[in-house]
């Protein structure tokens, strides 16, 4: 499942499920899980200030759902690095409500040249930084 959010300092993001994200069944839209996961990865990435990192495109998004979220639920998200490849980095966002796993979303970023969008290698210094967050 992953680490408990309370045991991993500075890797937690939280939100309360708003009305705009609720479907006709009273559950959070599945697409909203992806949006929230991307927000959590963005917050995680903010830790890396002042770096000259490559441009990234989203290469893959995959979600697993365990229990539906409802209006007003308080959700904690833990972001970990799931994989570090030669040209890609994967992030897993673990979502919990009251300590119960509700979903995991993996977001894979591919490093690329910003003008040509051709794949490029992850810089070694960036790979080293990511390793400290490997799940």
Which functions belong to the PLM regions below?
Residues 2-60, 113-135:
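Hot-dog-fold acyl-thioester-processing enzymes
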Residues 99, 107, 126:
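Short, flexible active-site-adjacent loop segments at beta-strand->alpha-helix junctions, enriched
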Residues 94-96:
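Core beta-strand residues in small-molecule sensory/regulatory alpha/beta domains
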Residues 43-89, 102-105, 110:
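Hydrophobic beta-strand-centered segment that forms part of the acyl-chain substrate-binding groove
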Residues 98-100, 117:
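A glycine-centered beta-loop-beta connector
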């Amino acid at each position: 499942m992953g680490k408990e959010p309370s045991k991993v300092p500075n890797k937690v993001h939280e939100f309360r499920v708003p009305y705009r994200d609720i479907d006709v069944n009273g559950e959070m839209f599945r697409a909203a899980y992806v949006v929230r996961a991307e927000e959590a990865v963005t917050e995680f990435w903010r830790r890396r200030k002042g770096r000259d990192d490559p441009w990234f495109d989203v290469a893959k998004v995959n979600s697993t759902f365990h229990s539906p979220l409802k209006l007003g639920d308080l959700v904690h998200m833990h972001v970990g690095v799931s994989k570090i490849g030669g040209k890609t980095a994967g992030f897993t966002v673990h979502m919990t409500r009251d300590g119960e796993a509700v979903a995991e979303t993996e977001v894979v970023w591919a490093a690329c040249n910003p003008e040509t969008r051709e794949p490029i290698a992850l810089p070694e210094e960036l790979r080293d930084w990511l390793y400290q967050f490997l799940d």
